[in-house]
């Protein structure tokens, strides 16, 4: 099984959702997470705080420099993610479609690089 990153994208300036819509989304995501766990596809997941809570860390000239705010100035930021196991890209895309429906937002799918096992 290969691992994939499913990134949930939040669009800056999108219409605010009602408390009821947010609760429905939380419930749908919780059900989706339970499905992933039951199927053996779950590796890890998390929701992120807004981009204004980010700190960028850079090593420059032998020093570590930190900057408040997101790395990229963009209308879209990652709001959360899943790391999943799937048989292939088609299976990962199918899972991402269910995740997108659950969180009511776009989900980007990216495979992890294959890393040789240590030994």
Language-model segment annotations:
Residues 1-119:
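Conserved, structured core segments of small domains
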């Amino acid at each position: 099984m290969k691992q994939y990153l499913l990134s949930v994208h939040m669009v800056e300036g999108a219409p605010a959702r009602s408390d009821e819509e947010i609760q429905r989304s939380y419930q749908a995501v919780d059900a989706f997470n339970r499905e992933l766990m039951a199927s053996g596809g779950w590796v890890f997941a998390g929701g992120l705080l807004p981009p204004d809570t980010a700190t960028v860390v850079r090593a420059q000239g032998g020093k570590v420099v930190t900057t408040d705010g997101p790395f990229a100035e963009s209308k879209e930021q990652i709001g959360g993610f899943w790391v999943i196991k799937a048989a292939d890209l088609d299976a990962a895309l199918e899972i991402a479609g269910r995740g997108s429906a659950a969180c009511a937002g776009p989900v980007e799918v990216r495979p992890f690089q294959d890393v040789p096992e240590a030994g």
